[in-house]
Amino acid sequence: MNWTTDKVRQTWLDYFAKKDHLVLASKSLIPINDPSLLWINSGVATLKDYFSARKTPPSKRLVNAQICLRVNDIENVGFTSRHQTLFEMLGNFSIGDYFKTEAIDFAFDLLVNYYQLDPKRFYITVYEDDETTYKRWIKHKIDKNHIIKCDKSRNFWDLGLGPCGPCTEIYYDRGEKFDPKKIGEKLFFEDIENDRYVEIWNIVFSQFNNDGNGNYTELAQKNIDTGAGIERLVSVLQNSPTNFDTDIFLKLIKIIEAFCPFKYDPNSYFTFDPQKVKEQSYFRIIADHFKAITFTISEGVLPGPNERNYVVRRLLRRALIACKKLQLNLAFIEKIIDEIIASYENYYQHLKAKNETVKQVVLKEINAFNKTIDLGLVLFEKSVKNNTLTPQLTFQLNETYGFPVEIIRELVNQKGLTIDWTVFDQLMAKHRSISKQNNQTINFEKQNINLVNFKTKSTFFYHKNKINAKVIGLFDENYLPVKELNNQSGYVVFDQTVLYATSGGQRYDEGSCINHSNNNDQKISFQGVFKGPNKQHFHYFLVGSFKLNDQVTLSHDETWRKLAANNHSLEHLLHAALQKEIDPLIKQSGAFKSAQKATIDFNLNRHLTRNELEKVENKIRSLIKQKISSKEIFTDFEGSQKLNAIAYFEEEYSQHEILRVIRFGDYSVELCGGTHVANTASIEDCFITDFYSLGAGRWRIEIISSNETINNYLKAENQKLIQLKSELEKVLSLIDSSIFKVELKELQQRLDKFILPEKITQLRDASDTLLALKNDINQLKTKNYKVSQQALALSIKKQLLSLVDENKSYVIATFNDVEPKLLLQTLHDVFNQNQTKNFLIINQFNESNSFIVIGNKTTTIIEKLRNSFNLKGGGNDKLFRGSFQDNVTPQKLNELFQNK
């Protein structure tokens, strides 16, 4: 059976739907109100509120296919068989419903009777004390020698506190060809990833509660959480050497091949040629990273210097370095993005509408990175010349200039230099820990006993820009309390601070401190500020020196704070305007605020019109012009309810004695811990830059504030309009004026009349005007193409007929860059008029020698060709289509068939 990725996914969803599971749509890659995650990285990540009982699930049985992103060890992508950044997780879940027996039965039934896998090739791991699971697998006649009992380290999920339980893993034996060294079974038993025994499914039984001291009690409500990576399952079903040799990846790699001088060979997996492996890895990196880039940008995460934005930038830069290694023509970019969207749009329907946006963002970032690469190389060459190359400088190439680690190592090796890579690796590890901590901001490692026990009081001042403070807590990067850190990374807590910590969807303040206890008044910048479990602000630094009781001066970046406050207050006004102007049932389901912009996510069963968005926008402008002062009210939960304050998490807020309410007149009243403007006039202006679907009835609005930000945005958008206008003029110049004279004149006049918007309020009309013109020009382009194709078909037909000779059995011809479909149709027409002849046609299309044979008993012709040339392809007795790997000319064919 031909198992495509789409078919594997749909089979999974259909199977569990028949078993009374509710099918959930894939959620956004960006976690909703979950600062513990930078990205959604598992199928269960979007369901945590159901498992924790914070929310009631829509059904006790759930199933999904969830898009995920993991970038914690990005350097491995492309060099291993199954490591990817973007992947899909298939999952079935039970929340207080079925348990071990049914979960195992479902897995066995689906794998054997639907995916048609051989149960004799199953290898199973179970927790050593879990006899129920062991016996259930035995009941399914799994060979006892294929079931291994493992200890807690392998088959027991436990975070140290809270729900936990055993798990069972299903592996599939792919055969000896994936185990040439005969060590696969040894690796499997030692829990080491290998290509023969591939894990395809993991079932976690949430059965116990850990009180934090290693005491386990049975849970009243037991749950099932399972996960199966779709790419792993597809590679098994397609018998592919690696995940990168499955259907979707191979489509992308085919596009890459068409634009570079190298070829990708799935069979190179079996050759163990180091140079070939390295070459093939670049294909994989490009395909994988462009998938991730397409999905992340389609969800509004643009390349940038911080957090999620930096991940996208790094992925793109790493992909571009691989492009350079393959001497890749960057014209492939639009093609590969089109193919990614085409491969996934049936299930991830939001992608199609973001096609042009993804392309524009990628191309803009490429132009910027090309300049950055040059600057980085100048810095590198200068340091080599001056003999000042250090681990710190090579680290700077990665952090500041975006050079992937493997490229940095190659640059150093090419110069025959040596540096202390241990120091470099330590700096890289510290840098990665920033992302790691951003992933863990929810209660900042709530389970860590050192942080839980740290209860020294610290005060945050909302309305001060600078403050003198004392160091009251120091922790290394592993959260171990220390008395001193010297030029190291770690976390520092002050008795008072003015730096806002990431929370409530608002990013931490940019800021720094001057440590007066150091002889040189060392300035130390902070790469993150996070709330600990006892609400203190932990300031993360990459390199710095502190001792307990050091005296410092703390300050935040006032411009950053002002813009972030603008956008946070703007988000409150936007939320209120959506409720009052559109639908009172709209409720924010996620938000993000920084100095650059604000976003709000909400549920609604329909698309908002442009008029509705502008109505909301104009209402906010009115509130800005009214110069409404903000009011900060401290009260308890009951008091906040009397004020009708909006609270996103009532069960959480109700546990706090004192709450902070931010009020803008009678229009907006919300519980909030973020920074805000004193008066709406500070916001200056607003503009909605984007509105799009996140799927499943969820929508996102992106909005910006301040005159400077909006003016810069208008300039950037005008550059896009200028570029589009230039592209449209080029299209018009290629249309045949002798045929479409009237249409060309009318379209050119419209294009000449187009004027760039001078005000932000004119931007949408200008964009709509040019897009409408683009649509009309493309329609004319299509007409022109059809006419040109008709003319080309007529020309080809005349050429073929001129070659027909009643004394010859074969008509042999060659063409350049003719669309295969057009050539085949024309060839059929000519053959129908000359059915005693055999037509052998070479077409040099997309840098390959495609070949068509139409005639009588083509199998005899093809057999003769195969004996003489390296020919690939297939067909029947009347038609053959394929390609030559050799340089085959009409002269050689005439000689072979004695067509004289």
Curated annotation (Swiss-Prot):
SUPFAM superfamilies tied to this protein: Class II aaRS and biotin synthetases, Putative anticodon-binding domain of alanyl-tRNA synthetase (AlaRS), ThrRS/AlaRS common domain, Translation proteins
**Which catalytic reaction applies to this protein?**
tRNA(Ala) + L-alanine + ATP = L-alanyl-tRNA(Ala) + AMP + diphosphate
One Gene Ontology cellular component annotation held by this UniProt entry:
cytosol
Q: Which GO terms describe its molecular function?
A: alanine-tRNA ligase activity; aminoacyl-tRNA deacylase activity; ATP binding; tRNA binding; zinc ion binding
Q: Which domain of life is it from?
A: Bacteria
Its Enzyme Commission number(s) read 6.1.1.7
Binding annotation for Zn(2+): H568, H572, C672, H676
- Single Gene Ontology BP term? alanyl-tRNA aminoacylation
The Swiss-Prot or TrEMBL record lists the needed cofactor(s) as: Zn(2+)
Q: Could you list this entry's UniProt keywords, alphabetically sorted.
A: Aminoacyl-tRNA synthetase, ATP-binding, Cytoplasm, Ligase, Metal-binding, Nucleotide-binding, Protein biosynthesis, RNA-binding, tRNA-binding, Zinc
Location(s) in or outside the cell: Cytoplasm
Annotated cofactor note: Binds 1 zinc ion per subunit.
Alphabetized InterPro entries for the sequence: aa-tRNA-synth_II/BPL/LPL, Ala-tRNA-lgiase_IIc, Ala-tRNA-ligase_IIc_anticod-bd, Ala-tRNA-synth_IIc_core, Ala-tRNA-synth_IIc_N, Ala-tRNA_ligase, Ala_tRNA_ligase_euk/bac, Thr/Ala-tRNA-synth_IIc_edit
Q: What is its main location?
A: cytoplasm
Question: Which NCBIfam families does the protein's record reference?
Answer: alaS
Q: Which HAMAP family match?
A: Ala_tRNA_synth_B
What is the role of this chain?
A: Catalyzes the attachment of alanine to tRNA(Ala) in a two-step reaction: alanine is first activated by ATP to form Ala-AMP and then transferred to the acceptor end of tRNA(Ala). Also edits incorrectly charged Ser-tRNA(Ala) and Gly-tRNA(Ala) via its editing domain.
What does the record's free text say on domains? Consists of three domains; the N-terminal catalytic domain, the editing domain and the C-terminal C-Ala domain. The editing domain removes incorrectly charged amino acids, while the C-Ala domain, along with tRNA(Ala), serves as a bridge to cooperatively bring together the editing and aminoacylation centers thus stimulating deacylation of misacylated tRNAs.
The entry's family comment says:
Belongs to the class-II aminoacyl-tRNA synthetase family.
Query: What name has this protein been given in UniProt?
Result: Alanine--tRNA ligase
The organism named in the record is Mycoplasma genitalium (strain ATCC 33530 / DSM 19775 / NCTC 10195 / G37) (Mycoplasmoides genitalium)
